[in-house]
Regions:
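Histidine- and acidic-residue-rich, metal-dependent catalytic cores
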Residues: 2-193
Length: 193
């Protein structure tokens, strides 16, 4: 790893571990599975590293969302939803200010974009969404539904995969197929059967 980005990453690690220990677990899980997907796709070592880092810090902008919204135990009002959606731009700006590479910044900015163009912040569609963000979109969704939230209980891995397929237009179909293959290959190693 480039030494010029090690200090900013150490800062981000310290910040997330002390600010939101449960979020840190999510970030590590998303990073691990996104990295496995990137490697399976045969991406370059640099691309894999960017995806590993971008996946880990994809939600870093949530640190600047009011706690009353971040930890709200129910569904958001339209205004709360708009505030929460700002985490993508805030996170991207933060990573950019810390000097992280553009592909890492792009993951934070675009990880809520949907393959069908219905996502945010820019309503990108298809392959206009960077590959790292398309990978993180899938892995993040899976990890989110396999863990308890204030407004719902965790799903089994089987049910989580069904949920991804119910919203399949949100995800790159080739990457979704790869993810499902990888989950089945590593079924016993993934928490929350």
């Amino acid at each position: 790893m480039d030494l010029s980005i090690k200090s900013p990453l150490a800062f981000l690690d310290f910040t997330t571990q002390n600010f939101d220990p449960h979020g840190d677990i999510h970030m590590l899980a998303v990073s691990k599975h996104a990295t496995i997907m990137a490697a399976r796709l045969g991406l370059s070592a640099a691309e894999i590293e960017w995806i590993e880092v971008g996946a880990k810090y994809h939600d870093i902008g949530k640190l600047f969302i009011p706690e009353s919204i971040r930890r709200f135990p129910g569904l958001f009002t339209p205004v709360e939803q708009l505030v929460m959606q700002q985490h993508c731009q805030i996170g991207a700006q933060m990573l950019q200010l810390l000097g992280l590479p553009a592909p890492v910044v792009a993951i934070a900015l675009n990880h809520q974009e949907n393959y069908d163009g219905s996502g945010y912040p820019s309503a990108l569609r298809g392959r206009n969404i960077p590959i790292g963000a398309r990978i993180v979109r899938i892995v993040d969704s899976f990890d989110a539904v396999t863990h308890d939230r204030g407004y719902r209980h965790a799903c089994s891995k089987k049910r989580a995969l069904e949920k991804l397929h119910e919203r399949s237009t949100h995800y790159d179909p080739d990457l979704l197929d790869l993810f499902e293959t990888l989950i089945h290959e590593t079924w016993d190693a993934v928490p929350g059967k």
